[in-house]
Amino acid sequence: MPASLLELKRKIASVKQTGKITEAMRMVSASKLNQTENRDKDYTVYNDHVRKTISHLISSQVVDSLRERDISIDKNNISKIDYTDVFGLGITADMIQPRKNIKTTGFLVVTGDRGLVGSYNSSVIKNMMSIFDDERAQGREVKVLAVGSVGAQFFKKNNVNVVYEKDGVSDVPTFDEVLPIVSTAIKMFLNGVYDQLYVCYTHHVNSLSSAFRVEKMLPIVDLDIGVKEAEAHKELEYDIEPDVNSVLMKLLPQYARSTIYGAILDAKTAEHASSMTAMQSATDNANDLVSNLTTKLNRARQAQITTEITEIISGANALE
């Protein structure tokens, strides 16, 4: 058999094997996607309830404080509130009160630990570099908490200040895995490492679509605190034991944990969806390549057979 035919056969066998591998990887990603997608949907409901509860608790205390001082309840007055007047000195007020003269912004950025996930990692990195440029243009220092080795390595190579990094998060992350990340993020904020913290990740929309998302985590503001007095009477009545500070001391760290865990779970779901799509595309390309190579092989065989028949006929004619 001519060398060209043998080479085509080897290529076909190699591409078929690659196609089997990518199809297996697609199936694994689909299985992981199914697990994280279901958990993500359930957890989103829980996280929304935690957020709503904290929003109402803070709002009710702010509204009561304004009432006691006969100050009108409007967004302008609410934006000027000093939360130490409402909650006293301590972690509760520190986690709620916006900082003045913000000099440093922290970003908790979630990427993956590996490639073969389409544009998942590159999209996050591209968006983050644009955000970093905007922050620096405003005279603010940027500090990054990187979850995922791809982002951490890229940022360090590009002279971004990475103050914390975490890799090896499970494909189906557990709540316990997130606790050290949350603890570090809160501690750095309270210690003044940064004046505000944003969580940046890829939000899973569906199997074919995702969206880059940036959420402010600390200080905990903009939780629908701007309520009307009528809404305050209707929605924000609480019987609190032993006191609001004690309740918020429990809820605020829970909110931080919920925000970060929800972001990582959502990001992992988007990563699995992107991986599944990428592997499906790779499998389809492998099948197309096998089809094209098989066509070339058949044509080469046909040409070889035609040549051999022509040679036989020519030889027979020469003997006559």
From Swiss-Prot:
Q: Would you say which domain of life the source belongs to?
A: Bacteria
- Which compartments does it reside in? Cell membrane
Q: Does the keyword Ribosomal protein belong to this entry? A: no
PANTHER family, alphabetized: ATP SYNTHASE GAMMA CHAIN, ATP SYNTHASE SUBUNIT GAMMA, MITOCHONDRIAL
**Annotated family:** Belongs to the ATPase gamma chain family.
Q: What does this protein do?
A: Produces ATP from ADP in the presence of a proton gradient across the membrane. The gamma chain is believed to be important in regulating ATPase activity and the flow of protons through the CF(0) complex.
Q: What is this protein called?
A: ATP synthase gamma chain
Q: Name one GO cellular component term.
A: proton-transporting ATP synthase complex
Q: Does the keyword Ion transport apply?
A: yes
Q: How does it sit in the membrane?
A: Peripheral membrane protein
Q: How is the activity of this chain controlled?
A: Increases 2-fold following exposure to low pH.
Q: Name one GO molecular function term.
A: ATP binding
Quote the subunit structure annotation: F-type ATPases have 2 components, CF(1) - the catalytic core - and CF(0) - the membrane proton channel. CF(1) has five subunits: alpha(3), beta(3), gamma(1), delta(1), epsilon(1). CF(0) has three main subunits: a, b and c.
Induction summary: By low pH.
Q: Which UniProt keywords apply?
A: ATP synthesis, Cell membrane, CF(1), Hydrogen ion transport, Ion transport, Membrane, Transport
Residues in coiled coil: none
